[in-house]
Structures are given as structure tokens and as C-alpha cells.
Amino acid sequence: MTESFAQLFEESLKEIETRPGSIVRGVVVAIDKDVVLVDAGLKSESAIPVEQFKNAQGEIEIQVGDEVDVALDAVEDGFGETLLSREKAKRHEAWLMLEKAYEESATVTGVINGKVKGGFTVELNGIRAFLPGSLVDVRPVRDTLHLEGKELEFKVIKLDQKRNNVVVSRRAVIESENSAERDQLLENLQEGMEVKGIVKNLTDYGAFVDLGGVDGLLHITDMAWKRVKHPSEIVNVGDEITVKVLKFDRERTRVSLGLKQLGEDPWVAIAKRYPEGTKLTGRVTNLTDYGCFVEIEEGVEGLVHVSEMDWTNKNIHPSKVVNVGDVVEVMVLDIDEERRRISLGLKQCKANPWQQFAETHNKGDRVEGKIKSITDFGIFIGLDGGIDGLVHLSDISWNVAGEEAVREYKKGDEIAAVVLQVDAERERISLGVKQLAEDPFNNYLSVNKKGAIVTGKVTAVDAKGATVELADGVEGYLRASEASRDRIEDATLVMSVGDEIEAKYTGVDRKNRVVSLSIRAKDEADEKDAIASVNNKQEEGNFSNAMAEAFKAAKGE
């Protein structure tokens, strides 16, 4: 009875061991090119694909005679052969290893081999695990290229074999490893000290540096004294660098680091090295809509404003003048050491066409050029050197109002003018067209003095008075009250357009270029002259009579 029970128990164990999915131990009996023969003590030897016995490097990891665990796929496949799987056995072993690591909070080794939504995939001895993006490191990591393909340690934080779900954390391993080192570092860390670290992550605003359990931020503005567009210009992930501790907040465990502070500040005493007016060469490092930046020495850049790029083109885009990388000659215009700003000039290193014009032209010189534009206030004429001169509306014609005179011109016309004034500093040249001829108004006044009797033709008349053309380009004005010795309320009653008149020149308005006229004053003057003439004749008659009487008396008559 006892033997029967023992026999039955042993047979039941064998049944369990030979069920599909069971893990059995076998011996490698042969290794062929494509298969490995394994004897697991079953009905027949099993041929297993050789690929299932290769490691990650593609090397066969067994020899003939080695014992290996394999999974039983089928006791008999219909051809009398037993089907075994080394791959499934490996997977079973991997799950056992993961369960043990999970229970004991131990680390496991794996390789990050892909990116998925929310994180990454990790290969753990044939088991695919999920690594959340937030658990890659103690700091957020955007780029994992430096980690992919490398064997790393992880902790299993979630395990469900039935659902084939494994979640791991690299952050937990780092925090655990860095705990002791971190405590020691925090205890010794002081502001001003120099420390070594490894760049572990880059952002648009800087780089995070692992100091050994503690991360410090190397801000982009503290990487170099020069302008830095992106941290990758200075450091790369994985670089080992020496930095200076600028600020350490022990309570919040925040460390600010500096790289440029390891060297001397190039801005110190820069005004002494480059006095205003100094000419030097530099390299164009950046272009903007408002100018370009030029590096004049390592870590020192100045701005050439767009207005200081060209003497004649004020609104030209910097890209039309220079390119990034160009070596250019510039002049120091201004230095603000406190604000760390240098104003540079590009055009100041070239000949100033305004100054050249001032040196080669005098007031009254005749110039010629094409009309470049016509505005509400005058005409711009293109001159040698790419500069413009302005003919103001008031300097177009002696006789015609500027608004009317300008209509006779159009863009592109060749035109002559006279230089009236040159202000090289303000970059202004005043020209005149009417000055090409003599001023008829001044000529008229030089010939006709105040008080003279002049003649003219009425060109316009209203109640208040009449406008009189005295000569070509010369006007006079006769007020109604000056039109007659009689009281006149309305000039139209005594004058009409076209009337020829004779009047006295009584005054001049040089600003408005008008001669004041008076018929009344002329008539009064004429009357006075007539009276004087009569009186003279009477006096002459009386004198003649007196002489005759005296002559008679002398004869004794």
C-alpha cells in the first residue's frame, strides 16, 4: 500500500513536470549551425534554434555538456518529437529575477531602447519595461541620446506578470546612490568655491550640472562674457567642467553656477583700452533688425546701430551691409561700462560724403542732379556721393508760390540749383532754384527809391484795395483808403482790373515782397508842387515890378 502511494505520488510529479509550459533542465548534447540539441530526459531530444542561445552581442553562450533550463512547449508534436524553448525559459528566469528584485527593492540592469508616449522602453533580459519620462533622472531630461544603448541600473516600482506590465525607475537608483555623496557635498559646499561636475541636461536657458548628488544650474548668461545664443555653443551633455559656485540656497538646495567667472572680466577698464574714436577690427556675431553685433575681443561685443552703418542709407537692413562672420573695421562711439554696452560705428571708418561736399562746395556754387523725390515741403536732388540736397518750396521761384511752382517738376528731371547752406554735422544741404536768376524784387527796389512815382497795371481788385503789377515779378498794393483824396469805402468803385495807374511808392514789405502804393499821396504831392510853382511865379512877378520902379527912380523920372 505504501509503495503504491509513493509510486502514484512520483508519477503525479512527473505529470506536472511534463505539462506544456513547465521548466525542465536539460543537457546540451550537440551544437549545429542552426540548432542546438538538448536532452531533457523526455521521449526524445529536442532541436532548439541556435538564436535562442545567443547573448546580446550575438555570441553563443553555451557549450556541449552544459546544463540549461528550457521550457516545455509540447511533449509530442505529432511527429514523435519533444518541443523545447530556451527563450521562454529565459523569460521565465527574467520574471523570477524581476519578482525578487521587486520584493527586495534591489536594482536590475537594463538598456533604454526606445521612446514611447510618456516615457521610454527598457529591455530587461528579454522583458520589455516602461520607464516614465519623469523617472529618467532627478531632473527633467528632454534628450536621452546619451543614455540610449548603455547598460543602466533601474529599480522595479511596479510588476504585473499576468498583464505583462513592468514599470522601472532610474531616478530611484540615482537618488539612492547619491544620498551619501549628496550629504557630504551639501555640508562642504560654499559660495565662491570651484567644483567639478558633469553636464547632464541642456535647456534654452542654461545647463544642469551634476556636482555629485546635487544638481546646479549654469545659466546661459553665466557661461561666457560674450553673447551666447544657446548653451550648446559652450557645453555638451556629458562634458566634465569646472565651475564656480555663485549662489547656494541651503534651505531650498539650489545651486547657481558660473563658468565665465573663472576668468577675468573683460569689461573692467574697457573704456581705457578703447577710448571714444578708436578704430579697430572685429567679427560680426549676430544680425538684428536694428543693427549688428561685433565682437571686438573675446567676451566683448558692441552694437552697430543701423543708423551708423551707412552714410546715405538710413533704413537699410543690416543683412544688406554685412554678414555673420565678416571681419569689419568699426569705430568706438560710446562706452557704458556700468550697463556693459558699447556703441560702434561702421560708416565712421569710411569717407563722409557730407563732409566731402562741404569741403568742395561753397555757398553760391551751382550744382546739378536728378530729382529723387518731391514732398510737401520741397524737392530732393541727388548729388555726388549718394547724398541729397533739398530745394524748399520757398526757393523754387521768385514770382510763383512754391505749391504752384513745384508742379512744373517731376521725379527723374535733371535740375540745376545753387548751394545755399551746408550743415555736414546734421547732414543737410539747402539748395535753391530761384537763386539761379537775380531777384526782380530787389532789382526793382534798387532802381526805385521810396517816395518815387511809379506806374503799374491793376491785376486784382476788391473792396479793400487793389493788387498792382509794377514789373515782371514785382507787385504793389494800393489800399482803398489810398486810392483817392476823397473818402473811398470800396476800391472797386474807382478801379478795375487792367487799369493803368500812377502812384507814389510809400513803403515796402520785404517779407511778403510787396510795395505799398498811394494815389492819394501822389495827388497830395502833385497839389503841393503846383502851389509851390504858383507862389514862385508870383514872387518872380513882384520882383520884376520892384526892379522897374527902382530903375525909374534912378533916372529921375
Curated annotation (Swiss-Prot):
Which PANTHER family does the UniProt entry name for this protein? 30S RIBOSOMAL PROTEIN S1, SMALL RIBOSOMAL SUBUNIT PROTEIN BS1C
GO CC, alphabetical? cytosolic small ribosomal subunit
Recorded hits in InterPro entries, A to Z, give: NA-bd_OB-fold (IPR012340), Ribos_protein_bS1-like (IPR050437), Ribosomal_bS1 (IPR000110), Ribosomal_protein_S1-like (IPR035104), S1_domain (IPR003029)
As given in the record, the signal peptide range reads: none
Give the function comment from the record. Binds mRNA; thus facilitating recognition of the initiation point. It is needed to translate mRNA with a short Shine-Dalgarno (SD) purine-rich sequence.
Protein name in UniProt? Small ribosomal subunit protein bS1
Q: What does the record give under GO molecular function?
A: mRNA binding; structural constituent of ribosome
Lineage runs: Bacteria, Pseudomonadati, Pseudomonadota, Gammaproteobacteria, Enterobacterales
Name the protein family.
Belongs to the bacterial ribosomal protein bS1 family.
CDD domains, per the entry = S1_RPS1_repeat_ec1_hs1 (cd05687), S1_RPS1_repeat_ec2_hs2 (cd04465), S1_RPS1_repeat_ec3 (cd05688), S1_RPS1_repeat_ec5 (cd05690), S1_RPS1_repeat_ec6 (cd05691)
Would the keyword RNA-binding be found if you checked this record's keyword annotation? yes
